[in-house]
């Protein structure tokens, strides 16, 4: 008789990622307090589920997050993760529970404006990787630090201090099934990498998990280029700027890497709406710069 672990595994993952979202936000806020950031009362959130934005009266921070990056991989047991970004904002986002009609709409619009900030306004970002080990990477704008969950003591232990992504690499992480749909500059660069005719003269290999957290985590440790570029089918790519692209770009840049759409820095783009999508390439600075140079010469 064949037994399936799918229902129990999915239930476990759902519970686990909810716990880690709360844990990550608490850790980040505590760190912000320790580093003498402003007082925290309550926190507003925007996430990748159906409920776009939740704002509480008097909050000092806005947390944006992707609860379970790579959720389509759950059945296959492939690494998944959680992405979180935290922004600071003004005190003018207070919703009166007695308000009605246009007054509420105006106040809610102000709350949304407080959420739609460029990545340059991030005060903290983190991701948690759920794999053979549970890793947490955090930045407060002064380097990237990784922690591994030690199950024997039930605590996160510092495993990598002041992470620096190697400037050179020979690995790229992209879904090459879409190669024919990519922009010509990107195709030319990747073709050169595969053939060993790129700027480095080294032949690249492909390593693609299909989970942004998993691929970026490996890139931070070993070097490489992670990309989810736009193509003829999805011109703007598929990653969400506010709660995927910007927080992960903050982490990558703090580790000494580059993150771009190919034409502009991801961190400098102000979202126009919560689920706005953008193309992304990030990683080792010399390899990513080769892509940027190709676009600039187009």
Predicted stretch roles:
Residues 1-18, 22-27, 32-298:
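IMPase-like, lithium-sensitive Mg2+-dependent phosphomonoesterase catalytic core
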């Amino acid at each position: 008789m064949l037994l399936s672990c799918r229902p129990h595994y999915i239930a476990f993952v759902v519970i686990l990622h909810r716990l880690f979202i709360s844990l990550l936000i608490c850790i980040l806020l505590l760190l912000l307090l320790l580093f003498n950031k402003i007082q925290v009362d309550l926190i507003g959130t925007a996430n990748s589920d159906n409920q776009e934005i939740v704002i509480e009266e008097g909050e000092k921070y806005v947390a944006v997050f992707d609860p379970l990056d790579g959720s389509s991989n759950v059945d296959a047991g492939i690494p998944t993760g959680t992405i979180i970004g935290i922004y600071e904002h003004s005190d003018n986002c207070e919703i009166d529970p007695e308000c009605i009609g246009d007054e509420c709409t105006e106040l809610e619009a102000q709350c949304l404006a407080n959420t739609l900030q460029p990545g340059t306004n991030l005060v903290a970002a983190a991701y948690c990787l759920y794999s053979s080990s549970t890793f947490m990477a955090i930045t407060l704008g002064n380097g990237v630090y990784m922690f591994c969950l030690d199950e024997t003591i039930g605590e996160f232990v510092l495993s990598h201090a002041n992470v620096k992504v190697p400037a050179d690499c020979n690995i790229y992480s992209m879904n090459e099934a879409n190669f024919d749909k990519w922009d010509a500059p990107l195709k030319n660069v990747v073709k050169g990498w595969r053939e060993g005719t790129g700027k480095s003269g080294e032949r690249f290999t492909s390593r693609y998990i299909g989970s942004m957290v998993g691929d970026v985590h490996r890139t931070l440790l070993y070097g490489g280029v992670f990309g989810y570029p736009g193509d003829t089918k999805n011109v703007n790519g598929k990653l969400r700027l506010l709660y995927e692209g910007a927080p992960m770009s903050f982490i990558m840049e703090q580790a000494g890497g580059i993150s771009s759409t190919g034409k502009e820095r991801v961190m400098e783009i102000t979202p126009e709406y919560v689920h706005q999508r953008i193309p992304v390439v990030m990683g080792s600075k010399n390899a990513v710069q080769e892509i940027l140079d190709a676009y600039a010469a187009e």
